[in-house]
């Protein structure tokens, strides 16, 4: 079973923050808009370790009681084809990081809700999950020298 995470949109940094949700929670972790986090999720995972979570490839900060650094993520299956989305998500996010125009944050939020959570939670495809780290996280490199590669295998 995949670990459950809540998303919170931080408009100041233009990133999605993920926080682990305790095993006692039920239902999808996105009951409302991405900006709304249930108050109980902030320290749901103990700071000591995250060995009970089944995700691999997450930085150590993912298991802190304060939650992980800013992460973006997508499922590998959706990344490997251009049929399922009008734009390539890495291209859109890369353009945003270097100041070029890209799709709105709303499009990215919808992409994540429709594609990632369906594959990750409902189908249990955490093996194919990849993690995108955007800025501010010192636990994992954002990209290699050139060409830029945002993704690390799960």
From Swiss-Prot:
GO terms for biological process: DNA-templated transcription; symbiont-mediated activation of host NF-kappaB cascade; symbiont-mediated arrest of host cell cycle during G2/M transition; viral genome replication. GO terms for cellular component: host cell mitochondrion; host cell nucleus. It comes from Hepatitis B virus genotype F2 (isolate Argentina/sa16/2000). This is Protein X. The gene is X. Pfam families: X. InterPro entries: Transactivation_prot_X. Belongs to the orthohepadnavirus protein X family. It comes from the Viruses. A fraction may be phosphorylated in insect cells and HepG2 cells, a human hepatoblastoma cell line. Phosphorylated in vitro by host protein kinase C or mitogen-activated protein kinase. N-acetylated in insect cells. Multifunctional protein that plays a role in silencing host antiviral defenses and promoting viral transcription. Does not seem to be essential for HBV infection. May be directly involved in development of cirrhosis and liver cancer (hepatocellular carcinoma). Most of cytosolic activities involve modulation of cytosolic calcium. The effect on apoptosis is controversial depending on the cell types in which the studies have been conducted. May induce apoptosis by localizing in mitochondria and causing loss of mitochondrial membrane potential. Keywords: Activation of host NF-kappa-B by virus, Activator, Apoptosis, Host cytoplasm, Host G2/M cell cycle arrest by virus, Host mitochondrion, Host nucleus, Host-virus interaction, Modulation of host cell cycle by virus, Transcription, Transcription regulation. May form homodimer. May interact with host CEBPA, CFLAR, CREB1, DDB1, E4F1, HBXIP, HSPD1/HSP60, NFKBIA, POLR2E and SMAD4. Interacts with host SMC5-SMC6 complex and induces its degradation. Interacts with host TRPC4AP; leading to prevent ubiquitination of TRPC4AP. Interacts with host PLSCR1; this interaction promotes ubiquitination and degradation of HBx and impairs HBx-mediated cell proliferation. Residues 68-117 are annotated as: Mitochondrial targeting sequence.
